[in-house]
UniProtKB/Swiss-Prot annotation:
Gene (name only): SCPL23
TM segment ranges: none
Record's signal peptide: 1-22
Compartments in which it is found: Secreted
PANTHER family with a match to the protein in the record: SERINE CARBOXYPEPTIDASE-LIKE 22-RELATED, SERINE PROTEASE FAMILY S10 SERINE CARBOXYPEPTIDASE
Task performed by this protein: Probable carboxypeptidase.
Organism the protein comes from: Arabidopsis thaliana
EC class name: hydrolase
The protein's Enzyme Commission number: 3.4.16.-
Active site annotation, chain numbering: 178, 375, 427
Listed name of the protein: Putative serine carboxypeptidase-like 23
GO cellular component, one term: extracellular region
Keywords: Carboxypeptidase, Disulfide bond, Glycoprotein, Hydrolase, Protease, Secreted, Signal
Residue pairs linked by disulfide bridges in the UniProt entry: 85-338, 247-258, 282-306
Length: 454
């Protein structure tokens, strides 16, 4: 397996661009201006990188450089989860990107808490079939999984850094949320093995990664979701006891008795936004989808004011696609936030990320895990249960951290890993608590503990 991995990497390296062609490719990918965009002082690039020639799989990226010292600031790759959901629709447009989309999808306005003040941000739509990323082999949409996604994300990075050689050897970090709790550590492991295979200074200079409200271990994620729903008075004592009695948190398929327990839990939830239980739901959405999501039956509501629909209007505009060098064939299809064909046909999903965490903490990478504390879908309870099984020695005991003269959350520092909660944030931490999320990022990039006082 390792030999096959090395052969693939060598083939990728042999196909990388020369310096003259990389400059030309950068010029072709440069975004002059997005429709409705305010004036900005930073450069943007977007386009495609082919990751599988035979199947015609190409991944779409959007790079937003920092407005100051972009030539020295680190590169940060942002990944959203799903699996099958767009990092451009969520991460770039709702969370950490420089722009927000207005309600009519006609204009953009600035996000004053954008993360590109601290790093050059690279958004990647992965795997093929998500967002603008595509495959010429339709069966690929029903054959995606963890392993292929991690491998092709690595191939993307190697080829992308050939196109943008100024980012080779630059400090590099990976950050993601939700099912990117798989993508991020799996890609970090691929990069770590890739760097070990070449005994020289790595062009992908991975320094660390950070995962927010991420899938970590199916057993503890599921158990934690039940505990969270009960402890936050969302389900009854009777239903909670029934879930604990009839649901196996290690099985992929649920029993009939477990399904009944989950059915009653769903009824007791009501129409609550499971991703942010104290936030209003988007009352204008008519196509809300119900997901079991491997934990509890919850209804997928996104944070008001219905930013999902704004993104779908904007990124389906032909002039936006032309400006972003997306959908170059102009084949009519609808850009969506999540590809449910990919989601519903996911082939391989590792049961636990804990073995990878053990391996990469030992490798000396900077690893942070954070949780918005109002998320009932991938809640803080499950994450804490999973982290406790790593049995890492405590360096700095639990304490409150501060942001803008308020408690931003709580944190504990272990040997090789930092855990932090973000008070008042949901599944998408930067949506509800953008300033606290930015404080978190600054501390992470600086390699410093979160502020103890204001």
């Amino acid at each position: 397996m390792a030999r096959i991995h090395l052969i693939i990497i060598l083939l990728v390296i042999s196909s990388t661009s020369s310096s003259s062609s990389s400059l030309r490719e950068q010029e072709e990918d440069m975004i002059k201006a997005l429709p409705g965009q305010p004036q900005v002082g930073f450069s943007q690039f977007s386009g495609y990188v082919t990751v599988n020639e035979s199947h015609g799989r190409s991944l779409f990226y959007w790079l937003t450089e920092s407005p100051s010292s972009s030539h020295t600031k680190p590169l940060l790759l942002w990944l959203n989860g799903g699996p099958g959901c767009s990092s451009i629709g969520y991460g770039a447009s709702e969370e950490i990107g420089p722009f927000r989309i207005n309600k009519t999808g006609s204009n953009l306005y600035l996000n004053k808490f954008t993360w590109n003040t601290e790093a050059n941000i690279l958004f990647l739509e992965s795997p093929a079939g998500v967002g603008f990323s595509y495959t010429n082999t339709s069966s690929d949409l029903k054959d995606s999984g963890d392993e292929r996604t991690a491998q092709e994300n690595l191939i993307f990075l190697i080829k992308w850094m050939s196109r943008f050689p100024q980012y080779q050897y630059r400090d590099f970090y990976i950050v993601g949320e939700s099912y990117a709790g798989h993508y991020v550590p799996q890609l970090a492991k691929k990069i770590h093995l890739y760097n070990k295979a070449f005994n020289n200074t790595p062009i992908i200079n991975l320094k660390g990664f950070m995962v927010g409200n991420g899938d970590m271990d199916k057993h503890y994620d599921r158990l934690g979701a039940a505990m969270y729903a009960w402890s936050h008075a969302m389900i009854s004592d009777k239903t909670y006891k029934s879930i604990l009695k009839h649901c196996s948190f290690t099985a992929d398929k649920t029993s009939d008795k477990c399904n009944w327990a989950l059915y009653f839990a769903y009824r007791e939830f009501g129409k609550v936004n499971g991703y942010s239980i104290y936030s209003p739901s988007c009352v204008h959405q008519t196509n809300q989808t119900k997901f079991l999501h491997g934990r509890l039956l919850v209804e997928e509501y996104e944070y008001d004011p219905c930013t999902e629909s704004y993104a779908e209007i904007y990124y389906n505009r032909p002039d936006v696609q032309r400006a972003m060098h997306a959908n170059l064939t102009s084949i009519p299809y609808k850009w969506t936030l999540c590809n449910m064909v990919v989601n519903n046909n996911w082939k391989d999903s590792e049961f636990s990320m804990l073995p990878i965490y053990k391996e990469l903490t030992a490798a000396g990478l900077r690893i942070w895990v954070f949780s918005g504390d109002t998320d009932a879908v991938v809640p803080v309870t499950g994450t804490r249960l999973a982290l406790s099984k790593l049995n890492l020695p405590v360096k700095t005991p639990w304490y409150p951290w501060y942001s803008e003269k308020q408690v931003g959350g709580w944190t504990e520092v272990y040997e090789g890993l930092t855990f932090a909660t973000i008070r008042g944030a949901g599944h998408e931490v930067p949506v509800l608590q953008p300033e606290r999320a930015l404080t978190l990022l600054r501390s992470f990039l600086a390699g410093k503990e979160l502020p103890r006082s204001y």
